[in-house]
């Protein structure tokens, strides 16, 4: 049977325009469009699970939630028997970047709807760093066309750290103020320049003020373990949430200061288990805890899930199922001031609902959004037309020259036989890096890698303006044993090209290949291309289906394993090595950056 087109993508009428009709349905004066009978209602307001519940839906909104909805059933009413299964609110991802999935908003929705996600809060600061405000507008308009709720946060820090990197575009306070007038902008994206907030940087203060004046939410990003005065200054500046905590004390500190603690489980970030102890062991009120993914790889979405995976994981860490569900529904809705629209099964809200057979395992049988079934048995019921990205969003990789092996040479100080250098140390399953040091040999005047001790080379190649600039340094933690190089045009947040390799000729081949295909990620070994994921949209996203992208990404992962890299989601770790707002040591087009002091440092110690 052919899938139904997504003709229902338009949101239902506002509650105020539908109230009289909802009242009539609730009173039995008019029939519902859909009645789901005999369910166990997971009530996130009261914390109860209420058996024998019927749900009546009209015009895409809940009209009646209670026992025996026979009075709302008419000749045209569709009736579904839940058979005693759980009725759960549609899940919300409170903070995420679609681009991390390597796919478009449309493809991301196709992948996550069967997993019960019906609301997403996306921060498109990846495409903003490449295409600026027009790029944000493209993703905003695509989001509006989706059959689920995809709210957009206006990126706040483009570039993420002025003076320490150069992105493909810049956003201003005026841009933020303009975006706050767009229909689907929910607030300001994560304010990553936390030192700037604490120092009263006028750009940061201006963006936050424009957001608050618009009555919208200010997203946070405090990527520091220092909970002293800089933290207090950051909170006083206005950010309302934070997802960068990695310890229970981080979550507690944020909640005590009136922030929402967002606990993330992405493809490479495993921060829920440590922070949830603030609730399970510390007894902290869970109302101000929210679950999110931040960054999810396409393979994770296709094979493991999305917010259902996060809720399941939180339950495994000791949370009661209802509490975990609250952290992925009503808590999120209240934070974004949308509790009258989403986040619960209650009259007037959008009819976003899951039929779940096993609550602890989050086994989702059916997914409804706006009163329409979108998925059953893990498969989409509907088709979502592809969004047509213009030519201006493509061909964004501008190298300026053909790279050669010599572009990756690092000249040693004159007369040195050995040098001590700074090394970026990868931490598996975490976004921060370590600032390491290593003694490396000098061969023919050039600093050599130390493959035996897992020290290989990293290069950042400028790709927005065709300057031909290359920053060279060293990295440890990938475990590469053979001759190889991996290059990616996804390099948070400025999104130049990052190449990590043990062989300079392979490094040149990998970077040049990305220039040919318009961006993506590629792995070479001994002159041969082992895997390629093309991402022609801004050099960040594929225009193919999520399943195809996931298969290509799995081929990449397997090729990396054969080269000796056993890191969990090594590609995601690779893509963050230039993120100059998360400690400790990063690379940018400016040079090596010490993110504990926000200063450029020399490669040689």
Swiss-Prot record:
<dbReference type="Pfam" id="PF13382">
    <property type="entry name" value="Adenine_deam_C"/>
</dbReference>
<dbReference type="InterPro" id="IPR032466">
    <property type="entry name" value="Metal_Hydrolase"/>
</dbReference>
<keyword id="KW-0378">Hydrolase</keyword>
<dbReference type="InterPro" id="IPR006680">
    <property type="entry name" value="Amidohydro-rel"/>
</dbReference>
<dbReference type="GO" id="GO:0000034">
    <property type="term" value="F:adenine deaminase activity"/>
</dbReference>
<dbReference type="Pfam" id="PF01979">
    <property type="entry name" value="Amidohydro_1"/>
</dbReference>
<dbReference type="InterPro" id="IPR026912">
    <property type="entry name" value="Adenine_deam_C"/>
</dbReference>
<protein>
    <recommendedName>
        <fullName>Adenine deaminase</fullName>
        <ecNumber>3.5.4.2</ecNumber>
    </recommendedName>
</protein>
<keyword id="KW-0464">Manganese</keyword>
<dbReference type="InterPro" id="IPR006679">
    <property type="entry name" value="Adenine_deam"/>
</dbReference>
<dbReference type="GO" id="GO:0006146">
    <property type="term" value="P:adenine catabolic process"/>
</dbReference>
<comment type="similarity">
    <text>Belongs to the metallo-dependent hydrolases superfamily. Adenine deaminase family.</text>
</comment>
<dbReference type="InterPro" id="IPR011059">
    <property type="entry name" value="Metal-dep_hydrolase_composite"/>
</dbReference>
